[in-house]
């Protein structure tokens, strides 16, 4: 019950607090007004705003759920997907999943909706796109995926597992799909299958690491393919 209530609360907070212009308006007239203006209206690129988004999702995807696990439930984070071990057949499954996903991502990158959405990073000052800013963004982006995988495949799946069993995977998949609603439709539909698959891996092996590596790999390839498609 706590996990489900927190899911509604946490996703709501992310939706509103990630809005950089709203944050800038809220901070106007305070001693941190310049910070709000920087994250919302940086003249060089939108990396400050993306960094703010990653900070918000990390707080609500990882920091607060981890606090609930440790302080409220008095449980071990390793029982919620953070086991430091590699699952049996890890590399084989990673290779198979990559062979399936990368061609699909490439085909999606050829569509207008995909090209309009990715990459999230936008550069306004004429700096070459392939450079330090892109590297910084990808590293920040990967932090976001750690929080996301921990929240959905760790916190949600394993907190619901004792009462719902295998159905915890499908309950988790509903909000996971919904966070993709602003993205191209093929990606949102794919999130259903991905949510079930990655949820099953965590349910079976007690680890989020394969899902995290796959997510980071796909996200990086999406950005590169999108840049290639744009020329």
Question: How would you name each of these model-derived features?
Answer:
Residues 1-4, 47-50, 165:
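Membrane-interface helix-boundary signature
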Residues 1-37:
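N-terminal entry module detector
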Residues 1-12, 62-66, 93-105, 171, ...:
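Alpha-helical transmembrane segments
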Residues 14-18, 67-78, 201-204:
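Structural signal for the C-terminal ends of transmembrane alpha-helices
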Residues 22-55, 71-144, 231:
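Juxtamembrane helix-loop-helix connectors linking adjacent transmembrane helices
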Residues 55-76, 143-162:
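Transmembrane alpha-helical segments in integral membrane proteins
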Residues 100-231:
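Transmembrane helix-loop-helix hairpins at the membrane interface
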């Amino acid at each position: 019950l706590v996990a489900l209530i927190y899911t509604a609360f946490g996703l709501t907070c992310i939706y509103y607090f990630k809005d950089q212009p709203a944050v800038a308006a809220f901070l106007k007239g305070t001693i941190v007004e310049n910070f709000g203006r920087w994250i919302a209206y940086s003249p060089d690129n939108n990396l400050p705003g993306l960094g703010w988004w990653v900070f918000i999702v990390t707080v609500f995807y990882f920091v607060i759920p981890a606090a609930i696990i440790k302080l409220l439930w008095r449980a071990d984070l390793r029982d919620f997907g953070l086991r430091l071990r590699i699952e049996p057949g890890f590399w084989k499954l990673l290779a198979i999943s990559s062979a399936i996903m990368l061609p699909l991502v490439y085909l999606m990158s050829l569509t207008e909706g995909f090209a309009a959405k990715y990459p999230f990073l936008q550069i306004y000052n004429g700096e070459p796109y392939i450079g330090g800013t892109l590297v910084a963004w990808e590293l920040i982006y990967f932090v976001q995926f750690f929080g996301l995988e921990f929240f959905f495949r760790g916190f949600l799946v394993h907190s619901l597992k004792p009462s719902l069993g295998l159905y915890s995977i499908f309950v988790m998949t509903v909000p996971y799909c919904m966070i993709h609603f602003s993205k191209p439709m093929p990606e949102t539909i794919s999130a259903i299958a991905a949510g079930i698959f990655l949820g099953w891996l965590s349910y079976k092996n007690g680890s989020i690491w394969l899902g995290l590596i796959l997510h980071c790999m796909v996200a990086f390839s999406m950005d590169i393919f999108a840049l290639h498609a744009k020329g």
